[in-house]
């Protein structure tokens, strides 16, 4: 038998000492350790020593040869895993782990080492089925005699309403997909009756274009256009487009590819009298890009936006029957493909920013590769800001490529060590009170927060590596932490530039809105930078209202410097012409998805070299610039060349729903055709979730509910909440909460008034134990204040963002329009859909319907509550939640919007719910094996009750499901008539369990 000493790889596979500890935390919870044997006295050294001796005596001894042979024999069989329930020491568990590793297997210890698993496939950190204490829960359902009598009476009077309604095919026949999606096809020329009319239209377009070219404003802008590198390649580009169905164009930032290439095609088609048949679509990954590029091209053509050039984004559109070139977000085009899979009448399609590898863009590329053989006349141009065109060219059958050189002035580059030396800024260690920094020794203790690049820097001998730098700089490098961005350092760098460097705008790259708002607050409080007569400070975030975003393109008055605080949206999606200085923090907020443990991880992560190159290039647009990189060069040198594509690092349920709506076969086979296919387990998880919420049936086909969810541009769970809210006459709360979850929370947390802000949020939540109710009440308060004209004061006093609330208002209106389009609400009768909009029990039940299977068990532990999920075992409430300070909950469960792994696994935006809400609106109720109860979530939740109560619950749930199915298959069904008895019974049941 080969040797198998301790091996660090065993730990990575889930084995060894770390595995045993992980299994212990996940399986048995924290604390205790006495095996449940009487009083625990671990604080008593005598008792502790005796208990440890007892545990040691109870340990079995591992016979290595015996277990090697057992595992080898099992490996040749057909079973996927071997479960070992033996009391081995941690050292023996490590030995088993090493054996498994050498055999190419996986190992994990669960339930404090009492359940050891050797597996042929990777193992998750937690297994509910192996957790004796928290793996499942048995809950007895009780009901008062009065409630039992009322429910029985209401059910008795409920008239049976026949079969479950129209078939799926009938559903398809009933729906007008164009009206459902609320999209207008950008092919208005197809309305023209005959070729003569088209010819007249083409002549008119050409005549107008020639007249505009002769105007002084267009001539002046043409002189600017001709200086762009893209202009020099105009003829080569147009020839390539005419001769090839697919062309891949890479171009450095500032070369003009985004504004000029679509315009070249438009000008050529109109000049060649093909304007009537010309229908160009150019996709952009972000709303602001679609608007800004369309505006720029309109100006260069001497037109107003919405004439020959327009845009369409969610909630906003500027276009007309004259529009021949339409800029839209990738999501808008994907929804167009649902109603028009062949992109009828589209002549040219340009997909910009493909280098970003967003999920929508990768999804679109799969569709387009399948579409091209059916549309040989369609011309596809893929545009990338980085020189990685070969990968895209290969994907599209070795299509030709073209590179446009950049047009930038020289940009000096300063890394952290140079910035510190030049600015003489001192980074303080944590001992000095600056929470952003920390000594290298103390940082090494916080292993959980480390990444590989930070570890790489910590292993460097600072005094040796940076011996040419001053001692002050070396001390600062010792204190610097890569774990989080030092906002004080960013502020100091901006101040250094403004005091000592020449004029020009400053562009600062941060990871998200929290850092932008913190830095904005610091700048406003800074005695020098806070002077608004000298400095114009503008935040730039992808989710900001478009009106606010447009300000960043305007040049400030003389003697006033513009400072833009941005996320990675400013890397390549937009161009701010007057930037001379870039301050790069080196990170971007990026979601990764742990498919094995079914949890999203949201942490700022280091960017790629390609992104760093893009950021640097923003500084050389108008003159020689400087890029201040606030991280060491050794970290930059270790950056990956490109970021991971989004499709392989995020949950896929919304994408999978879109795939089914396109009717392109199975989800797995479709995604296997991606440029870089996602992990098969991530795909399985998404399909499983869609089946759990009822969007897909057992054979992976869309259900009637799934078809409706496809029409709502939100996560499937949020879409389901909207539909259930409309059906159960609770539509206003559903609209508000859905808008907040789909966009962002309106609550802001100022750094120096965090406690007051938390208190304001708790005030809105009241005694509901619900973040969702807090969102709802905050919006309702804003709406009331707006009616009185004092919404600004209301937002200021309650720490709310008026910008976010206005966007929520717009999204509510959009969701209401969509619900109206598919027949779920009649906007002329709002009261009919809001009978229960102020009933907290019904609102909680609607939340349960939408958020299931995101369920947490609340288990009392003395004077506090511990929280457990099926996938991960013990979790924590996010500190920003109103429930973070609640010690004891009166109801046994929480439903939550998302769980995210940062420093710990947190659940965000949670609501305390009752047994009855879960039983009526959760997943399928499965009779237990004994026949004395019912189960949910694959047996994770068990409910027992008397025979009469069980039968009553199952009867009512059956009526609820029947009513939901009828309404979903026939949205015109009047619930107030057809389902009055069922709804009344549900309300009665929910109200009976008030806390």
From Swiss-Prot:
Q: Where is the composition biased (Low complexity)?
A: 161-170
* Motif range (DEIH box): 352-355
Limits of the Helicase C-terminal domain? 484-663
Instruction: Detail which positions bind ATP.
Output: 251-258
Q: Which CDD domains match?
A: DEXHc_RHA-like, SF2_C_RHA
Polar residues bias locations: 171-181
Chain positions covered by the region annotation Disordered: 1-42, 156-192, 429-450
Catalytic activity, reaction form: ATP + H2O = ADP + phosphate + H(+)
Q: Where is the Helicase ATP-binding domain?
A: 238-405
Q: Which InterPro entries match?
A: DEAD-box_helicase_OB_fold (IPR011709), DEAD/DEAH_box_helicase_dom (IPR011545), DNA/RNA_helicase_DEAH_CS (IPR002464), HA2_WH (IPR048333), Helicase-assoc_dom (IPR007502), Helicase_ATP-bd (IPR014001), Helicase_C-like (IPR001650), P-loop_NTPase (IPR027417)
Q: Under which main EC class is this enzyme filed?
A: hydrolase
What is any Pfam family matched here? Helicase_C
UniProt biased composition (Gly residues): 25-37
**Could you tell me which SUPFAM superfamilies the record lists for this protein?**
P-loop containing nucleoside triphosphate hydrolases
List the GO molecular function terms.
ATP binding; ATP hydrolysis activity; mRNA binding; RNA helicase activity
Which EC number(s) are documented for this chain?
Answer: 3.6.4.13
Query: Which keywords does UniProt give here?
Result: ATP-binding, Helicase, Hydrolase, Nucleotide-binding, RNA-binding
Annotated family: Belongs to the DExH box helicase family.
Name of protein:
DExH-box ATP-dependent RNA helicase DExH1
Q: Give the organism, scientific name.
A: Arabidopsis thaliana
């Amino acid at each position: 038998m080969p040797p198998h000493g301790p091996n660090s790889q065993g730990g990575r596979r889930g084995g060894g000492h770390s595995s045993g500890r992980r299994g212990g935390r996940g399986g048995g919870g924290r604390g205790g350790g006495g095996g449940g044997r009487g009083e625990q006295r671990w604080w008593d050294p005598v008792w502790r020593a005796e208990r440890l001796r007892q545990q040691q005596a109870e340990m079995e001894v591992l016979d290595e040869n015996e277990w090697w042979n057992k595992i080898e024999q099992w490996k040749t069989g057909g079973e996927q895993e071997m479960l070992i329930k033996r009391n081995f020491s941690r050292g023996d568990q490590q030995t088993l782990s090493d054996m498994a590793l050498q055999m190419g297997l996986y190992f994990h210890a669960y339930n404090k080492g009492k359940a050891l698993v050797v597996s042929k496939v990777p193992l998750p950190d937690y297994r509910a089925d192996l957790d004796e204490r928290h793996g499942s829960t048995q809950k007895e359902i009780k009901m008062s005699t009065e409630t039992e009598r009322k429910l029985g009476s209401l059910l008795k009077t409920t008239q049976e309403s026949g079969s479950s309604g129209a078939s799926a095919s009938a559903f398809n026949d009933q729906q007008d997909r164009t009206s459902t999606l609320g999209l207008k096809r950008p092919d208005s020329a197809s309305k023209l009756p005959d070729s003569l009319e088209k010819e007249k239209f083409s002549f008119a377009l050409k005549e107008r274009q020639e007249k505009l070219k002769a105007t002084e404003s267009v001539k002046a802008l043409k002189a600017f256009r001709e200086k762009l590198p893209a202009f020099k390649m105009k003829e080569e580009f147009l020839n390539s487009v005419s001769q090839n169905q697919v062309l891949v164009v890479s171009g450095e930032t500032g070369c003009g590819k985004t504004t000029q290439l679509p315009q070249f095609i438009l000008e050529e088609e109109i000049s060649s009298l093909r304007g009537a048949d010309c229908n160009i679509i150019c996709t952009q990954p972000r709303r602001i890009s679609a608007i800004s590029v369309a505006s720029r091209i309109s100006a260069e053509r001497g037109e107003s936006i919405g004439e020959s050039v327009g845009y369409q984004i969610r909630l906003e559109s500027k276009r007309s029957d004259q529009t021949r070139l339409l800029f839209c977000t990738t999501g808008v085009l994907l929804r167009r493909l649902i109603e028009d899979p062949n992109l009828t009448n589209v002549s040219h399609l340009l997909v910009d920013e493909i280098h970003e590898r967003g999920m929508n863009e990768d999804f679109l590329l799969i569709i387009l590769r399948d579409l091209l053989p059916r549309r040989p006349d369609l011309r596809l141009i893929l545009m990338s800001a980085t020189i990685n065109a070969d990968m895209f060219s290969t994907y599209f059958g070795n299509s030709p490529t073209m590179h446009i050189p950049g047009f930038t002035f020289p940009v000096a580059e300063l890394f952290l060590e140079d910035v510190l030396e030049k600015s003489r800024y001192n980074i303080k260690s944590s001992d000095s009170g600056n929470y952003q920094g920390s000594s290298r020794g103390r940082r090494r203790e916080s292993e959980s927060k480390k990444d590989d690049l930070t570890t790489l820097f910590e292993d460097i001998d600072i005094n040796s590596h940076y011996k040419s730098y001053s001692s002050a700089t070396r001390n600062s490098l010792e204190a610097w932490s890569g774990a989080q961005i030092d906002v004080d350092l960013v502020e100091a760098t901006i101040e250094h530039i403004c005091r000592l460097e020449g004029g020009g705008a400053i562009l600062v790259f941060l990871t998200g809105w929290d850092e932008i708002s913190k830095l904005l607050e610091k700048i406003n409080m800074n005695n020098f930078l806070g002077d608004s007569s000298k400095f114009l400070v503008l935040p730039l975030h992808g989710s900001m209202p478009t009106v606010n975003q447009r300000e960043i393109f305007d040049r400030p008055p003389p003697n006033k410097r513009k400072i833009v605080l941005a996320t990675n949206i400013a890397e390549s999606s937009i161009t701010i012409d007057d930037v001379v200085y870039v301050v790069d923090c080196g990170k971007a907020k990026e979601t990764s998805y742990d498919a094995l443990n079914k949890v999203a991880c949201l942490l700022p992560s280091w960017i790629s070299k390609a992104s760093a190159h893009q950021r640097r290039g923003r500084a050389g647009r108008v003159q020689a610039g400087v890029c201040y990189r606030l991280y060491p060069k050794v970290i930059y040198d270790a950056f990956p060349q490109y970021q991971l594509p989004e499709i392989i690092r995020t949950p896929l349920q919304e994408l999978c729903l879109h795939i089914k709506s396109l009717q392109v076969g199975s989800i797995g086979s479709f995604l296997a055709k991606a440029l870089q296919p996602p992990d098969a387990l991530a795909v399985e998880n998404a399909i499983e979730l869609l089946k759990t919420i009822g969007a897909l049936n057992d054979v992976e086909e869309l259900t009637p509910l799934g078809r409706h969810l496809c029409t709502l541009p939100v996560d499937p769970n949020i879409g389901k909440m909207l539909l259930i809210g409309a059906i159960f006459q609770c539509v206003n709360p559903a609209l508000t909460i859905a808008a907040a979850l789909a966009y962002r929370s309106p609550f802001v947390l100022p750094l120096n008034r965090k406690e007051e802000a938390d208190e304001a949020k708790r005030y809105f939540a009241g005694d509901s134990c619900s973040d969702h109710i807090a969102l709802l009440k905050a919006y309702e308060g804003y709406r009331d204040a707006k009616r009185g004209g004092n919404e600004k004061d209301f937002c200021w006093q309650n720490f709310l963002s008026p910008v976010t609330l206005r966007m929520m208002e717009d999204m509510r209106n959009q969701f209401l329009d969509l619900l109206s389009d598919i027949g779920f609400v009649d906007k002329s009768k709002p009261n009919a859909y809001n009978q229960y909009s102020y009933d907290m029990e019904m609102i909680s039940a609607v939340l349960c319907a939408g958020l299931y299977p995101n369920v947490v068990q609340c288990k009392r532990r003395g004077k506090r509550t511990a929280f457990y999920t099926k996938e991960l075992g013990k979790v924590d409430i996010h500190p920003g939640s109103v429930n973070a300070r609640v010690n004891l909950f009166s109801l046994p469960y929480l439903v939550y919007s998302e769980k995210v792994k940062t420093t710990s696994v947190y659940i965000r935006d949670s609501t305390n719910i009752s047994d009855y809400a879960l039983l009526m609106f959760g997943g399928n109720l499965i009779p237990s094996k004994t026949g004395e109860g019912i189960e949910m979530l694959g047996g994770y939740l068990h409910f027992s009750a008397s025979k009469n109560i069980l039968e009553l619950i199952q009867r009512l749930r059956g009526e609820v499901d029947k009513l939901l199915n009828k309404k979903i298959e026939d949205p015109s069904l009047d619930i107030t008539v057809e389902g009055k008895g069922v709804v009344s019974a549900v309300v009665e049941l929910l109200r009976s369990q008030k806390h």
